Amino acid sequence: MKYREAKAEDCSQIYALVQETIKTVYPKYYPAEVVEFFSALHSPDNIAQDIGNRTVAAFYEKDVLIGTGTCRENHITRVFVLPAYQGQGYGSQMMQYLEERVLGRYEKVCLDASLPACQFYEKRGYVTVRHETWKCENDVVLVYGIMEKDLTAKA
């Protein structure tokens, strides 16, 4: 797998990857209102803004964009792997790269964990430190975990 910093011209492809993953995976875990919330949260404008801030990584396997992740300071976000490539170790490789961007600058890395990803993050040494809520349409409430990993223990 190869990776590089995402560029402005990658925005539409990254957006398509994120949306495909949300629409394929999230309905198995969340009601439609929450799926739509996630879809809107990861809008082209939000992705473009992060690309402009040079915080987005693009991950490729044989010239195919298979994943993306964003790292702002010590906060990892918008980590998505195309459904066809999930369960093959790509997510772990992506997280290793993103965590290395934080290592040496911060003692901890944090992220907001969706239900589909909680176990994955726990296996990587993340612990849930609290839960947050977000009110979606039709009074549906999204509950998600705030997770942290101590990078000092990784020596």
Per-segment meaning from a language model:
Residues N53-G67:
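Conserved beta-hairpin
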Residues E122-E132:
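Conserved acetyl-CoA-binding loop of GNAT-fold acetyltransferases
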Residues Q93-V109, Q119:
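Conserved acyl-CoA
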